[in-house]
């Protein structure tokens, strides 16, 4: 796991590492992490130490000083950094090591970086995925499955707070976009 500055870090780790969690995924476990963090984003700077402590103390996750060391010791990687700007640099050593990769929102800090991440992964034949969990919500999936008939028009609302270092809807806009795309059949 790369970037320990979001509440997704302990949440995903609990799902994977805790057999008592109702959503537990057997066979997968978070075993290593690279702290990361962005000093110029308060939601990163102010939370990274606490989430890092939780991973180490509650889940016994080993911290690595570099991403290159981390990828030598894991089978797959989650990039969880709340700041999309370092995602390309963080993804490069993961892709070079041929490790399957999930990138949490935002996928990158710019369209250029997002396209480069996907290009590198495709070229290296590395599985890469990024998604909003709202795509898999019960109501969204029911509508996609035809519960109300064929969808010909839809509007979506969702959290979409803005962040000064990220353009447009990069920060949270994926939630509404994914819900909309899902019910419209894409």
Region locations from a protein language model:
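Contiguous beta-strand/loop segments that form the cofactor/metal-binding neighborhood of enzyme cores
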Residues: 165-167, 171-186
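Active-site phosphate/pyrophosphate- and oxyanion-stabilizing loops and adjacent acidic/basic residues
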Residues: 53, 141, 177-181
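A structural signal for well-ordered alpha-helical segments within the folded catalytic domains
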Residues: 6-10, 88, 115, 137, ...
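A contiguous active-site-proximal alpha/beta segment in oxidoreductase catalytic domains
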Residues: 107-166, 176
């Amino acid at each position: 796991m790369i970037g320990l500055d979001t509440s997704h870090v302990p949440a995903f780790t609990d799902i994977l590492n805790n057999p008592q969690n109702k959503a537990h995924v057997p066979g997968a476990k978070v075993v290593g992490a690279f702290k990361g963090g962005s000093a110029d984003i308060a939601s990163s700077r102010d939370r990274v130490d606490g989430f890092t402590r939780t991973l180490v103390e509650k889940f016994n996750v080993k911290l690595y000083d570099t991403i290159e060391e981390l990828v030598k010791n894991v089978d797959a990687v989650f990039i969880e950094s709340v700041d999309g700007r370092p995602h390309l640099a963080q993804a490069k050593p993961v892709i070079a090591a041929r490790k399957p990769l999930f990138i949490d929102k935002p996928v990158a800090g710019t369209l250029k970086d997002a396209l480069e991440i996907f290009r590198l992964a495709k070229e290296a034949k590395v599985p890469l995925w990024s998604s909003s969990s709202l795509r898999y919500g019960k109501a969204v999936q029911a509508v996609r499955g035809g519960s109300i008939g064929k969808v010909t028009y839809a509007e979506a609302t969702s959290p979409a707070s803005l962040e000064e270092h990220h353009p447009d809807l990069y920060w949270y806009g994926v939630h509404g976009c994914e819900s909309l795309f899902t019910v419209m059949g894409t």
